[in-house]
Amino acid sequence: NYRCIVAHPINPPHLIPAVEIVPAPFTSQSTTKTVKEIISSIGKEPLELNKEIPGFVVNRLQGALLAEAFNLIKEGICSAQEIDKAISEGLGLRWSFMGPFQTIHLNAPEGIAGYVDRYEKMYQGMFEHLDIEWSSVIKLGLEEELLKLYDLSEREKYEKDRDNRLTKLILHKTKT
């Protein structure tokens, strides 16, 4: 059992380089090291977790963002299209080459400590309310809006466009 380990890719796995590496408490360090080397050797980026957690890291981060996105729809703050643009034309562009911690570290002259000092209470106040059932938001018209924007009968076209854009972004990132 010392060789048991989880290697969790992110969709679409043929393009996204990140692969979460999740050793069990009984997994040997040698196994973890070998798996990371194999993952790296095929052009992927291993993300080593210190311990297993439901959803691992990528799904949990995505889930946190989606929880607030569903809440914004529920509260009538903006449309799904505006939320998608907030990511694709805002956070996503920046986060594609620098993660959230690097971003906030650079957003305050004093780095992350200054950022936390300035904004911690504001962010804590923003998220006291997050107790939302995502399915209740679907009933408020979210699904209809998304189906108008992204007709699932054209899913293959959207996936091809996504893959082309990701490929270009990845190629761009490797050049700099």
Q: What is the predicted function of each stretch?
A:
Residues 13, 64, 107:
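Residue-level signal for short amphipathic helical patches enriched in basic/charged
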Residues 52, 71, 89:
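Short, flexible helix-loop junctions that flank or precede catalytic/ligand sites
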Residues 58, 62-68:
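Structural/interface elements that position substrates and couple domains in central-metabolism enzymes
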Residues 38, 71-72:
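Residues within well-ordered alpha helices
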Residues 33, 44, 74-176:
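NAD(P)-dependent Rossmann-like dehydrogenase/reductase catalytic/cofactor-binding core
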Residues 1-51, 55, 59:
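Rossmann-fold dinucleotide-binding core
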Residues 2, 26, 30, 64, ...:
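Charged, alpha-helix-enriched surfaces in structured cytosolic catalytic cores
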